[in-house]
Amino acid sequence: MFTASPMSLSKILARRDWENPGVTQWHRLPAHAPFNSWRDEASARADDNASRKRSLNGDWQFSYYAAPEQVPDSWVTEDCADAVTTPVPSNWQMQGFDTPIYTNDTYPIPVNPPFVPAENPTGCYSLTFEVDEQWLESGQTRIVFDGVNSAFYLWCNGKWMGYSQDSRLPAEFDLSAVLRPGTNRLAVLVLRWCDGSYLEDQDMWRMSGIFRDVSLLHKPHTHIADYHAVTELNADYDRAKLQVEVALAGEQFADCEVAVTLWRDGLSVATVSAKPGSAIIDERGNWAERLNVTLPVKDPALWSAETPELYRLTFALRDGQGEILDVEACDVGFRCVEISNGLLKVNGKPLLIRGVNRHEHHPENGQVMDEATMCRDIELMKQHNFNAVRCSHYPNHPLWYTLCDRYGLYVVDEANIETHGMVPMSRLADDPRWLPAMSERVTRMVLRDRNHPSIIIWSLGNESGHGANHDALYRWVKTTDPTRPVQYEGGGANTAATDIVCPMYARVDQDQPFEAVPKWSLKKWIGMPDETRPLILCEYAHAMGNSFGGFAKYWQAFRNHPRLQGGFVWDWVDQALTKKDDNGNAFWAYGGDFGDTPNDRQFCLNGLVFPDRTPHPALFEAQRAQQFFTFTLVSTSPLVIDVHSDYLFRQCDNEQLRWNIARDGEVLASGEVALTIAPQQTQRIEIDAPEFAAAAGEIWLNVDIVQTAATAWSPADHRCAWDQWQLPAPLYIAPPVEGTAKPDLKVKEDVLEVSHQSQRWHFDRASGNLTQWWNNGTATLLAPLSDNFTRAPLDNDIGVSEATRIDPNAWVERWKAAGMYNLTPRLLLCEGEQLAQAVTITTLHAWESNGKALFLSRKVWKIDRAGVLHGDVQVQVANDIPQPARIGLSCQLAQTPQTASWLGLGPDENYPDRKLAARQGRWTLPLDALHTAYIFPTDNGLRCDTRELTFDTHQMQGDFHFSLSRYSQQQLRDTSHHHLLEAEPGCWLNIDAFHMGVGGDDSWSPSVSPEFILQRREMRYAFSWRQD
């Protein structure tokens, strides 16, 4: 039995355990399945709060020091004079101590493993708690820390109890020897840096403290020490065996018996009792303290992410008189995970992984996760058709897995290992001195989490190269848990240490032949000789800011190539932290905003949702691409569609198809049909379409699938899938528009003035621009209508380029080098002509930089008898410059419209390579809703393929993209944070005939697909504009 140490604090610290990779713990108890230590079966079955598990969360005393050596020896027994109250769990950086540091892969400390800086911020926590004599005499008392970053020492009642590192797994200690009836005192010394920090180089905020739950756990003297349940299914999946192993501990275990019972809806399905003692396993005998039992189950309800059917399994330990000593319990899901014929399968069905990577992040609480936030994340994921989550890049809070079991998500559980900043990356993975530390991070994860049905894949970690340590750990996991595959991307994504080819940021059709670790195109990879494993991207579609272009291409490939089984989007939530400015106003901060160095700026903003879980527009693109129903227009006369269910296990029993036929947004007919589609089957639906009269406008069939009743993760009427098709319509001949008076041209010294009834247009003869437009005496322009060839750079345009490290290959650097952000117009022609029924103004501009013409823009403006301004624009692009971001026009309007209405793609922001989620229709939104508040400001708010646009007195027609914003492109370009943007007078209107895609395969290299780059060197467009 462990005896608490009387050594002083300074003597214990003098050993510098935190700089010894061979020391990962002192006196920490072995890993096991989570415990609650119920004392009756009913409570365990109901998962009620256990009276013998007491939370120690709450207010603790806290003192902060710059280094552990500064902590006085007396702190072990009494608080320091400067102690303050701090909440546990929390990160101390979020409580006003020390600095949070955001870096992607650069280590935040000098790289000299296993040594860390002498200046090593140290947090000293203390808490007093009460226990009575009966509690102490009736069993063992343990303390459980679910997460402490990065290493800590523990004292109780002045006695040193132990040490632990690995910030993302529990550390459990036996306090029994030092507890006393009445008041007891805990003291926890937490170090910011330890040698384990070299294994925790994940792309995240680097923070410290006791950031997960702390609890006291009371176990009887003889108790359950571990349990493990494995489900086995027959080939027809209608018979199951539940193989259960239970380990006991304590002096009297041999006299005890364990009743193992499987429950379903409160009823016992199967039960068996057994005494400890395993079968003989070798020449030395058996495990005396273990027992193995089998529970047969007929017609089991199978678990999947679609149908998260759960049973409850209880383990009741009884003494020789039949009295219950200890009860543990867990949820059980009957499911089989396997790889066969090159496919990852659950219950015999090949999966299509609709996955996302998720960091544990909260804008106010840092890395502290509460149940409400976890539930919200899962609900949003399921509402947007995700079925899988990767715990990037560490084991999560224990509750997360229980929620995934119950809501239904497939989980990749990942070890807390990343050495991204090492050179080479595999330096520690190939060093046997680091094998114990790496081993504990993998083995303890498996032993804690292996009972969860949601976990279908183990991951050995992230971006740590590939070394002999990985091979050893792979073999241990496969031996310990042969029921799950193992994945690991490091070393090229297809080493012998992975059952799944799991690259990150491989592209659909483009090879990236990096030296040593090439990334082949997805289609090529699965066809390579001797490669028979499934391919699932562990990271793809880097959703940084205004990004996610080309996501539909991935999903086309996934649906067309069975061994391309999906992937995990990077990533779920923008990792911004709430900070207050000098005026006390809160804003979302990113790398560098806390004075943290080194830092990687806004590279932490890669989420599909904002920090408060408000969706980015990209989330809707994922929802549409990943939807579980596909549609086919079979015929238009009669009007027939097929609806196919991609569900593998779910019978449609809560879905309804709602359809309407609309002309330019006006509904002509509608209806609804109940869906009764079996898994992977199709339902044919004939729609009673009316005869269409000849009229202006396009006719569209719109179909939505909605859930009629609320579910555990969605409200009633939640739309889970949709599609639309343009239908043939009778030819319509529009009558000519007749005006009452022809426009009049006046050639003045400085302007060409066109008048028509209550309207006047001024074309400046020096600039050639439309500088003012009066309507009923009101000036409508604050800045002239002028050519627009650039955009406020997106994160994907910037790539890794920054002031101290220019990437000449980044789009923004290529545009800068060509002079596109410093264009000067030179007017070559400006003339007006009075026609019989109209006035035309013709201009020709050369847009130059450093005396070189980059663009030629010829515009012919025509004002007709109806007072409509028609624009016909031809643009030539120089052959030796990079392709531009846009071809269009921009102006600043004098009025600020309250709303805008348009006929085109909407309602949400969409771009040419990210418009799968956009729907053709007529939409109306407030002006502010047309702006996307990306934390790092960029071009935003575009709506594509617009036929009509109406706001205030303005009406525009044509085929164009538009954005309306309170902020100019220049301000968006110059401003570092969204909260620093200042609304400008009026409103900025951008009309684009052509706009480059946003890209998104990754955010550090040009990733816009060729078809979404403006390759043509001559372009022409036209539109009309009128005011009422």
Swiss-Prot record:
| One GO CC annotation | beta-galactosidase complex
Residue numbers for the site described as Transition state stabilizer?
359, 393
- What is reported on the regulation of this protein's activity? Completely inhibited by Hg(2+), Cu(2+) Ag(2+), and partially inhibited by Zn(2+), imidazole and EDTA. Activated by Ca(2+), Co(2+), Ni(2+).
**Residue numbers binding Mg(2+) 2:** 599
Q: Which protein family is named in the record?
A: Belongs to the glycosyl hydrolase 2 family.
Q: Give the GO terms filed under biological process for this record.
A: lactose catabolic process
Subunit structure of this chain's protein: Homodimer.
Task: Give GO terms: molecular function aspect only.
Answer: beta-galactosidase activity; carbohydrate binding; magnesium ion binding
Q: How does activity depend on pH?
A: Optimum pH is 7.5-8.0. Stable between 7.5-10.0.
Q: Which residues form a coiled coil?
A: none
Chain positions of site Important for ensuring that an appropriate proportion of lactose is converted to allolactose: 1004
What is the protein name stated in its UniProt record?
A: Beta-galactosidase
**Stored Gene3D superfamilies:** 2.70.98.10, Galactose-binding domain-like, Glycosidases, Immunoglobulins
Q: What UniProt keywords are attached to this protein's entry?
A: Glycosidase, Hydrolase, Magnesium, Metal-binding, Sodium
